[in-house]
Amino acid sequence: MAPGANIHIPPAGPPEPGPLYSDFYQQQIERQRNNNYHSTSLRNMVATSVNRTALHPGGVQPGKGHTELEEELHEHAHIDYDRVAIIANPSVAALYEDALVYETGTAITSSGALTAYSGAKTGRSPSDKRIVKEESSEKEVWWGPVNKPMTPDVWRINRERAVDYLNTRNRIYVIDGFAGWDERYRISVRVVCARAYHALFMRNMLIRPSAEELKHFHPDYVIYNAGSFPANRFTEGMTSATSVAINFAEKEMVILGTEYAGEMKKGVFTILFYEMPVKHNVLTLHSSANEGQNGDVTVFFGLSGTGKTTLSADPKRALIGDDEHCWTDRGVFNIEGGCYAKCIGLSAEKEPDIFNAIRFGSVLENVVFDPISRVVDYDDSTLTENTRCAYPIEYIENAKVPCLSDSHPSNIILLTCDARGVLPPISKLTTEQTMFHFISGYTSKMAGTEDGVTEPQATFSSCFAQPFLALHPMRYARMLADKISQHKANAWLLNTGWVGAGATTGGKRCPLKYTRAILDAIHSGELAKAEYETYDVFNLHVPKSCPGVPDELLNPKNSWTATTSFSDEVNKLAKLFNENFQKYADQATKEVIAAGPVVQ
């Protein structure tokens, strides 16, 4: 080398792109953007390629390693991780960004919550629920209208259909979480979905693992949500383009033909209704639960729309959970990491805890908002009556976290929403009456909680959970009877429905302030000491007075204003109770049967 010659030292990083390379680079960036990929992934790819030439400016990309999660998805579901961007356990902010960019109907509301649209299905589709009929669970499952059987062959067809759909997406989301706050019984759940809205929903509803727990997370159950794509209608047993199917042997759930996020939540619930009693002798409950300052626990049974979420959000008591629980030999634990509250008619005055929980990180579902101010109109039911919000349970100021109690319930409240207006607002139940009304599960099907329901309809739902049950109702009922007997709990029938008359004959919904006053009297012990009278036909024990509640409201006969005969209406409902109970009478004791109404 000649003295004084300049020595060229190449840069440590990749060389500066020449014009041809630069054009290629920009073209690929644009192509990735059009295909909804993250352009940062391409920059990394181009920067790490080797053997770049003028003819082949992209060079050769070394084979990249895959994460443990990606390898599991590839092995079990054949997810093409080299083509599909697998976004695993993303942050709330990242899910907001993707939902806003890629999902129609998504916006940030004035409170900071994300609002999403679930499409044509704005409620659950119970008629499309299927359980795979296979050897390991066949003798346990309660087969019939609630749990329709699906053959393993049809399962495989629809499962592959869901996986094929997910493989056509440019990005899919994976959310890992736990169901059950008691570590002795919790199950690990993985959700694989195509919508950021669904991912954020389940991030809120499952119990969020720590960073350390996520490192080597292995799911017990996997949910494949391909809800944007229809089921194969021509396979055996399919009645529509919607399919919500669970396979207890494969430990998987597949959703097709519905984007309603509540299907995932209730699918996990059905899994727990199977796993807990069968494998652990633990009772699963469709209930909310809270705890007083003295450690006393109250459990609220009830169907959607009867007030479980609203009534358990009590500023004077710590919230254990609003919808799904298990009762063990040690106490009660919440299944979920979040709450899924109805929003229709919501206001800061009536339900401040829920109203204030709707903020950044929460997911509003099918609400209507002002396009300028982004303020949500909670009274607007244009899209559905079943407007909802999913938020982490920590958003409730007085939530008890971890969400479990070492105390056994001292008060068990069976919630009902009587559209006929003939059941008392509150009744004290004997053990036998508790069994009768638990097995009956009477309420009125509330507008919007299921697809196609717009007016209240009288219905019976065994264990207040019939759409979610996996086993025969009497199996849960016997377990509850044992718990009540063992722990000497007080039981109450609380009607949050109509008073004065029926829903169609001029009655009005029982004001929330009176329902809360009744609960306060239960928790203080005053109501248990009150003077009672017998309410005819149903033979219920009704208090003559309750602090904060008008006396005439406590006995429906005294507050009846409808032109129809009160006696006729009571007896009509009594007949419906007795007709429904015939389905379970062969497995019920004489004492429980006698605890039902006597038609006069």
Swiss-Prot record:
Instruction: Please list the GO terms describing molecular function.
Output: ATP binding; phosphoenolpyruvate carboxykinase (ATP) activity
PROSITE patterns on file: PEPCK_ATP (PS00532)
InterPro entries (UniProt xref) = PEP_carboxykinase_ATP, PEP_carboxykinase_C, PEP_carboxykinase_N, PEPCK_ATP_CS
Pathway assigned in UniProt: Carbohydrate biosynthesis; gluconeogenesis
Name of the coding gene:
acuF
**The protein's name in its UniProt record:** Phosphoenolpyruvate carboxykinase (ATP)
Q: Which UniProt keywords apply?
A: ATP-binding, Decarboxylase, Gluconeogenesis, Lyase, Nucleotide-binding
Q: Where are the transmembrane segments?
A: none
Q: Can the keyword ATP-binding be found in this entry's annotation?
A: yes
Keyword Lyase listed? The answer is: yes
Give the binding site residues for ATP.
Answer: 302-309
Q: Which residues pair up as cystines?
A: none
